[in-house]
Amino acid sequence: MESMSKIEAVLFDLDGTLLDSFPDFLASLENINVKSSSKKIDESVVRANVSDGSSKLLKLVFDIDTDDKAFDEHKRNFLNEYERNILMYGNLFLGVSDLLNFLLDKKIPYGIVTNKPRKYTEIILKKSSLLRQSKVVICCDDGFKSKPNPEGINHACNILGVPNSKCIYVGDHENDLNASLAAGTISGVCTFGYGFKKR
């Protein structure tokens, strides 16, 4: 790991890295499950796929394909529930507040590059004062290719005015690691998140 004296910025993934959003996702899935099915939800499946997007999550939890007639309704209902549940049950992971406060104290700018849509990310920012102090936030629908493509990380570094080689990117998914490597940033792997399966 580079010494902190060489680090000019830190960028983070959101779900599974800064934010434990699993409880919000689980509550949302359980709410639509009550309305549409009696199938018991496997929490381990939800936790293991939180970082893979809502479509994959719905396919696995409800055993439904994206071309199924009911899929669009399931997804719409889930996203409506999730919007209501954002940070109702989830929170920053243990230690994240201390880390972000440390970066603020050291005047090291931090930001977020996430595959989460802007609509939901903005709700999270409004509810978290520490995340709201991010100097840059790049979302999947901001016009850049999603991770593992490095476009979002590259743009974030440009906004911060920091060379990629002087920036750390931290994530919990292989897409995060691959995006970081492609961007030429220093890579940080968050093993307590959802994306990296136990090997």
Predicted regions and their residues:
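Conserved short alpha-helix immediately C-terminal to the canonical SAM/SAH-binding motif I
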Residues: L18, F25, Y120-T121, G152, ...
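N-terminal helical cap/lid subdomain that shapes the substrate entry/recognition surface
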Residues: S5-L14, L18-D98, F102, K106, ...
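Substrate-recognition/cap helix-loop segment adjacent to the acidic, metal-dependent catalytic center
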Residues: V34-S36, L57-D65, Y89, S97, ...
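Residue-level detector of anion-binding/catalytic polar loops
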Residues: K39, P109, I186
